[in-house]
Each structure stands twice: as structure tokens, then as C-alpha cells.
Amino acid sequence: MAPEITAEFVWSHIPKRPRESNKGSFGAVLAVAGSACYRGAASLTVEGALRTGAGIVTLASVEPVLAAVSARLPECCLCPCEPGAEGEISPQSIPRILRQKATVLLIGPGLGYLAQSTARAAETRTLVKKLLTGFSGSAVLDADGLNAAASLMNAGEELPRPAKELILTPHPGEMS
């Protein structure tokens, strides 16, 4: 029988942090998330990374998203990206994104893949492909990042992979 999940149970399974540690001791997450129409996804992504113990969290996104997230979560670092014609993250931002120091890349929430025009969907596929293959750490592919990766694979391309592990986090609708 599984144990009852209580606050005490959860706290007993969270390791104590060494007194001499600092935020750099607990990893750095780079979240590539959000678009002009989907700002909340980026905010929830960053908040989740911070709450689960990431030492440093950087959000790579377009200005309206960065403004909304920084007002709510001032501890988040920001990587401003060039906007595309529809308020998305332009692939022109890939070199800037890859220059960020991170141990984990999270890509996908709020990119708006399913709501995009054909041109914008192609740009999102480019983001996913180049960011994953150019990343030296582990990566989490979620939401619209999964949809873009599925589209790449449906076109006969291999699933792009980072240097370390790739974690896929589909919900039931994304698994079909």
C-alpha cells in the first residue's frame, strides 16, 4: 500500500541543503517559453522551476512575456528574444539563447505551436531542432515543444537530442 502523502512525508523526502551552498550549487534552468498570446505558460514554467529547487532560472522569451513574468517573479533572470511577426520567439534569437549558462533546457510551454500559421510553426520547429541539438546539458521537452518535435518526426526527421538526457512530458492529448 502506498504511503499517504502528507506535508510531513514530503518534507522528510526533501534533502537538506548544505549551509555553505549558494544558488549556483543547485543547477540552472533555461526556460524557452511563452509568446505574446501565451504569457501565463511561461510564468507557470518559471515558478515551477523555482519552487522545485533550481538555483537559477532564466526565461528566454519576447518582451511582453518577460515584463509579465518579471513583475510576478523578480528572482527570474531574463534573456530577451527577438519577436517574430506573430509575437513568437524568432529563430534569430537562437545564438543568444544558447549563450545562456544552464544545466537544463526546458522548451515548449506557451510557444503556441498548434495555434500558429504555417510559417510560425516552421519557426517553432527550427527553435526546437537547433536548441536541442546545440544544448550541452539535459533537456525537458513540453507542450508546444513536443508538438513541434512530433511534426519534425512526422516529416521523417529524427527527434533532436541534447548532449545529455532528453525528458518528454506529454499530457494525454500530446501523446496521440
Q: Where are these predicted regions, by residue range?
A:
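YjeF_N-associated NAD(P)HX repair module
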Residues: 1-32, 36, 165, 169-173
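Glycine-rich phosphate/dinucleotide-binding loop and adjoining beta-alpha-beta core of small-molecule
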Residues: 1-7, 60-176
